[in-house]
């Protein structure tokens, strides 16, 4: 995150970038289907742009934003999970996202 001007200094964010060996539309269909998310998150889609961006709200008021871009060998998924309230929450979200992305990668690589 570039500049926290106007933000509470206690608010944290998490950034993760993952490459997938499939087209962006396939990853978009998985990320855009909240039924395929980890159950513990209880996501609600707030906004999306076809095959490129999804913004989600979670019950703790944190906000994951996924951006997809096409790469020569597939696509890149960038996650900016913003408005995280504590270092512990950020650690937990990092574990959740890394496990889910690993699961999605395994699924699309079959």
Where are these regions (language model features)?
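Short, hydrophobic/aromatic-rich segments at coil-to-beta transitions
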Residues: 47-57
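A conserved amphipathic terminal alpha-helix motif
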Residues: 1-3, 83-110
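Short, surface-exposed beta-strand-loop junctions and turns on beta-sheet-rich folds
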Residues: 35, 62-63, 83-85
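Short, surface-exposed coil-to-beta transition loops
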Residues: 13-15, 60-65
